[in-house]
Swiss-Prot record:
Gene3D superfamilies: Ribonuclease Inhibitor
F-box domain span: 18-64
SMART domains, per database record: FBD (SM00579), FBOX (SM00256)
Source species of the chain: Arabidopsis thaliana
Protein name: FBD-associated F-box protein At1g66310
Residue ranges occupied by any FBD domain in the UniProt entry: 363-415
Lineage: superkingdom: Eukaryota
InterPro entries named among the record's database cross-references: F-box-like_dom_sf, F-box_AtFBL13-like, F-box_dom, FBD, FBL13/AtMIF1-like, LRR_dom_sf, LRR_FXL15/At3g58940/PEG3-like
Database matches in PANTHER family: F-BOX/RNI SUPERFAMILY PROTEIN-RELATED (PTHR31900), PROTEIN WITH RNI-LIKE_FBD-LIKE DOMAIN (PTHR31900:SF33)
Length: 442
C-alpha cells in the first residue's frame, strides 16, 4: 500500500473514532469528563462544535492555582464557573491553593464563604479543599448532600451544630482546630461515617483527641513527626464496628482503644516511644499495656521496627497479651536486630503467615536467642522479601524459622545475585523441623 493509501486508512480510522465519541449521549460524556482536572476538560472545547460548551455542563470543578499565572484569574474562573447553570447540581468541588491571595485573609475567607454557600445550595457530593489559614463557614457542616469531605490546611471552627447525614468519608490533613471539641462535633454529626483519616500538624490546638463513632469502619491516624509536640496527647478511640486501624506517630502517647478490640480485622502500627524505655516508668508501661490489649484481637498485623522494639522492651517487664486471632504478620527490621521477633511470635499461637520485609545489619547486638525458644506450632508460610546476602544475622533468621516451625509448608526467600552461591550452600546445611517444607529461592 502506498503512503497516500495508508494516510486515507488512518484518516478513516480517526473519523470512525471521532464519530463513535460524537454519538455518545451528553450525560455520559459529562460523567467521563468529571474524572478529569478542569484544565483538561476545558481543552476538549476545541474538538468540535458539540464540545465547545460541554465543559460548562460537567457537574464538577477540579482546579489547582498553579495552573494560573495570576491569583485573580484563578478566583475569576471559579466565579465564572459557578455562574454557569447555577441550578446544576455539583458532584465534585475540588480546589488547591497553596499561597495567600495578596496576603488578604479577609478576602480569602470571603471567597471561600461565597463558594461554600454556593456548592451547598447545589447539593455537592464531594468536597476537596486545600487552602491555607482560612476558616470553613459553618454552613458546610449542615450540608445534607455531602458524601465525601477532604480538608487540608484550613481551620475547623468551633461548631455548635453539625448535621452531615450522608458523609461516609472524611480526610483532614494539617487542619487547625478551634479546640478539642471541634473534631468531636464534626464526627458526631456524621451518622453513617465509614472512613476517617487524620494527618496532624504541629500546634493544631488539640490535646484530647476523641474519635467516637458507631458506624466507623476505617481509621487512619498520622501524628506530627515533630518530637515533643504531642507528648501529652490523649488519643481515645471508641468505634465498635472498626475493621481497619492505621496508626503512625513518633511516639506512643496516652492512648485508649475501647469498644473496638473485638472488631478490628487489620492493623498497621508504626509507633515508637520517642525516647529510651525506662522500666521504672509505670505510667508509660500502663499505656503500652492498654494499647497492646486494644489491638490484641486483630487478624492481620503490619508492624514497624520501632513498634516491635516497644513490644520487646515491654516484654522484659510484663508478659505480653496473647494475639490469639492473629493469622498474618508483616514486619520490617531497620538497624535493629530481628532477634526481638521471637518474643512477639510466641504470643501469636495461631499465626499462619509471616512476611519479613527489609532486613539490615543491626546497630546493636542482642542475646535474645541465647536460650531455647518455643516452637512456632501454627506457622505455615514465610516470605522474606529483602534479598539476602548470606550475612550471619540473615542466616540465623532463616535457621530460626526452619528449625522451630514443625508444620511449615513453604519458605520463600530472595537472594542477592552477588552472593547467591554462598547463600545457597549455607541453606543446604540448615536442618528443617518440617519434613514437608518447600524452600523457594528467587
Amino acid at each position: 500500500m502506498d503512503q497516500d493509501g495508508e494516510k486515507r486508512v488512518r484518516a478513516k480510522q480517526s473519523d470512525d473514532e471521532v464519530d463513535w465519541l460524537r454519538d455518545l449521549p451528553e450525560s455520559l460524556l459529562c460523567h467521563i469528563l468529571l474524572n478529569l482536572p478542569t484544565k483538561d476538560v476545558v481543552k476538549t472545547s476545541v474538538l468540535s462544535s458539540k464540545w465547545r460548551n460541554l465543559w460548562r455542563l460537567v457537574p464538577g470543578l477540579d482546579l489547582d492555582s498553579s495552573d494560573f499565572t495570576e491569583n485573580n484569574t484563578f478566583v475569576s474562573f471559579i466565579d465564572r464557573f459557578m455562574s454557569f447553570h447555577s441550578d446544576l447540581y455539583l458532584k465534585k468541588f475540588k480546589l488547591r491553593f497553596f499561597c495567600n491571595l495578596n496576603g488578604d485573609e479577609v478576602s480569602e475567607n470571603a471567597h471561600i464563604a461565597r463558594w461554600i454557600n454556593d456548592v451547598v445550595k447545589r447539593k455537592v457530593h464531594n468536597l476537596d479543599l486545600t487552602w491555607g489559614a482560612v476558616e470553613i463557614p459553618p454552613i458546610l457542616y449542615l450540608c445534607n448532600s455531602l458524601v465525601s469531605l477532604k480538608l487540608c490546611g484550613v481551620t475547623l471552627p468551633n461548631l455548635e451544630l453539625t448535621s452531615l447525614p450522608c458523609v461516609k468519608v472524611i480526610v483532614l490533613e494539617w487542619v487547625k482546630f478551634a479546640n478539642d471539641l471541634a473534631l468531636e462535633m464534626l464526627i458526631s454529626g456524621c451518622l453513617v461515617l465509614e472512613s476517617l483519616t487524620l494527618c496532624r500538624r504541629p500546634n493544631d490546638n488539640v490535646k484530647i483527641l476523641r474519635v467516637s463513632s458507631q458506624s466507623l469502619l476505617r481509621f487512619s491516624y498520622n501524628g506530627s513527626s515533630y518530637k515533643g509536640l504531642h507528648d501529652d496527647l490523649v488519643l481515645e478511640i471508641n468505634a465498635p464496628k472498626l475493621k481497619i486501624l492505621k496508626l503512625f506517630s513518633h511516639q506512643l502517647t496516652t492512648s485508649f482503644i475501647r469498644n473496638t478490640s473485638s472488631s478490628i480485622v487489620e492493623a498497621d502500627i508504626n509507633i515508637g516511644l520517642g525516647k529510651k524505655f525506662d522500666p521504672k516508668d509505670l505510667p508509660k508501661r500502663n499505656v503500652i499495656c492498654n494499647f497492646l490489649a486494644g489491638i490484641s484481637s486483630v487478624k492481620n498485623l503490619f508492624i514497624a521496627p520501632c513498634t516491635l522494639e516497644v513490644i520487646y522492651d515491654y516484654s522484659r517487664c510484663e508478659p505480653l497479651p496473647l494475639f490469639c486471632n492473629l493469622s498474618y504478620l508483616s514486619v520490617d527490621f531497620y538497624n535493629n536486630s530481628w532477634e526481638i521477633l521471637p518474643i512477639f511470635l510466641e504470643s501469636c499461637p495461631n499465626l499462619k503467615s509471616l512476611v519479613v520485609g527489609s532486613i539490615t545489619s543491626p546497630k546493636r547486638r542482642t542475646s535474645v536467642l541465647s536460650g531455647p525458644r518455643r516452637l512456632l506450632s501454627s506457622l505455615e508460610y514465610v516470605e522474606i522479601e529483602s534479598p539476602l546476602t548470606g550475612e550471619v544475622f540473615e542466616m540465623k533468621l532463616v535457621s530460626y524459622l526452619l528449625e522451630n516451625s514443625p508444620i511449615l509448608k513453604k519458605l520463600t526467600i530472595n537472594l542477592d545475585d552477588s552472593s547467591r552461591k554462598k547463600a545457597e550452600c549455607e541453606l543446604l546445611t540448615i536442618p528443617r523441623r518440617s519434613t514437608s517444607c518447600q524452600v523457594v529461592v528467587l
